[in-house]
Amino acid sequence: MSTKAWNASRLSGPDPSTPWSLKKPLQHGSRPPKGKRLTVCPPTRPKQTIRISASHASQQLDQAKAACLAVTIRDLEEATAVMRSWEHSLVTPQCIAPRYSIIMFMITAVKRLRESKMLTLSWFNQALMMVSKSGEEMRNLRTAMWILANLIPREVLPLTGDLLPSLQQQEPPMLKQ
């Protein structure tokens, strides 16, 4: 044990935690002694560049586009449901055989997009063959597909198949010929 006692009011001996440079009083005009500074830094790894392959980046882009397409399809479903209720409130049943309107074709196409995520030219040709007896329904089908092609953002349009990108580049179809 040490013979020197520590007192809270004054020190009876040197403080062991005081650095050596502060233990000796400095003379007027002199500089503190230059000692070797020991800076202990933990060893660090060199910075590494994170590399992302082109296929991984394109895969992430495709996933983002697919998510955007899913949101667009959901929004189109909601919009066509509103348009359908609006159309039914305005139109009274006048004939026995109901005809497909532009809105009905849009609803059918959006349902197909939701189920299979694709609208192909072969599907469009089959639909045209089914309504080939009615010139009005053919125009309605073309108009509905053209409207859909222009409602879906261009970035995700190629994900919908080959029909809508080809229709988007065309002129708007005439409603009455």
From Swiss-Prot:
Superkingdom as given in the UniProt entry: Viruses
Pfam families: Paramyxo_NS_C
Sequence segments annotated as region (Disordered): 1-37
InterPro entries referenced in this protein's UniProt entry, alphabetically: Paramyxovir_NSC (IPR003875)
Compositionally biased region (Polar residues): 1-10
Regions annotated as coiled coil: none
Similarity remark: Belongs to the morbillivirus protein C family.
Protein name as it appears in the record: Protein C
Organism: Rinderpest virus (strain Kabete O)
Protein's gene: P/V/C
